Amino acid sequence: MKSNIDKQAVKNFLLQLQDQICQQLEAADGQAQFIEDAWQREPGEKLGGGGRTRVMRDGAVFEQGGVNFSHVFGEQMPGSATAHRPELAGRRFEAMGVSLVMHPKNPYVPTSHANVRYFIAEKEGEDPIWWFGGGFDLTPFYPFVEDCQLWHQTAKNLCAPFGAEIYNEHKAWCDRYFYLPHRNETRGIGGLFFDDLNEWPFEQCFAYMQAVGEGYTQAYVPIVEKRKNTPFTERERQFQLYRRGRYVEFNLVLDRGTLFGLQTGGRTESILMSMPPLARWEYAYQPESGTPEAQLSEFLVPREW
């Protein structure tokens, strides 16, 4: 598996993907632009490297969102990582990726998340250990069946060239991963999720990661365009803020990437970029039966689209 590994090609793609996604989301918003915060790790820190954090605020469509590129490296993996993968002990490592979350203002536009990443751990005289990961998922507040079908059909189409079962496997993985056991519900309607992908040749794994990265806006932008001008009232806004609380719960309690980043001295501002600007909690809230708010629960279980 050592041959044909091209770290620079992966990095070049990720930088270009960040540019492309930002341009497409700015066009969908029509008003706000991403502000870039380029950062570098200080010498002597646990991790070296840097990245480009891009944040959009107070747009016509997006209340807040971020599209982050990072490329970090270290001389050895943290103990939290090698406990489950002892073969990584004593290896220097690099991790690079693009991660994004968009929180729309209009409750009829779903929140979306996407991430693609590459990891490699190397040691003199031994084959490198590498893998790709990523995916995208959608969190509607007032879901429409046709939007969910478009989202999943886009995912299914991009998976098709890589194997008949890839969509089913990575959809099911997404449903399992974005699940809140303390609420007994999924975070949203899912999409794709994969990790530790290295069983194919490097070029094929890289091509799949590229397809997933580029598939995000193909799936999301048409939904944004369709829903962004839907009228809404304070009632829908309050429900959106309440449901955003679930997003916060998942990210701070369950998300592996958030926990890993905070435990390993990652850049806190970039890690917490995924948080919504406003959210609320209400004790023992139950939506009135028969209302659109009550219907959301029907979508928060794994199902075929």
Swiss-Prot record:
The keyword Transport does not apply. A divalent metal cation binds at residues 103, 113, 152, 182. It is found in: Cytoplasm. It catalyses: coproporphyrinogen III + O2 + 2 H(+) = protoporphyrinogen IX + 2 CO2 + 2 H2O. Gene3D superfamilies: Coproporphyrinogen III oxidase, aerobic. The record marks 182 as: Important for dimerization. Signal peptide: none annotated. Pfam families: Coprogen_oxidas (PF01218). GO terms for biological process: protoporphyrinogen IX biosynthetic process. Keywords: Cytoplasm, Heme biosynthesis, Metal-binding, Oxidoreductase, Porphyrin biosynthesis. Its cofactor is a divalent metal cation. Pathway: Porphyrin-containing compound metabolism; protoporphyrin-IX biosynthesis; protoporphyrinogen-IX from coproporphyrinogen-III (O2 route): step 1/1. Residues 247-282 are annotated as: Important for dimerization. One of its GO terms (cellular component) is cytoplasm. Its EC number is 1.3.3.3. Disulfide bonds: none annotated. SUPFAM superfamilies: Coproporphyrinogen III oxidase. GO terms for molecular function: coproporphyrinogen oxidase activity; metal ion binding; protein homodimerization activity. Belongs to the aerobic coproporphyrinogen-III oxidase family. Involved in the heme biosynthesis. Catalyzes the aerobic oxidative decarboxylation of propionate groups of rings A and B of coproporphyrinogen-III to yield the vinyl groups in protoporphyrinogen-IX. Homodimer. This is Oxygen-dependent coproporphyrinogen-III oxidase. It comes from Vibrio cholerae serotype O1 (strain M66-2).
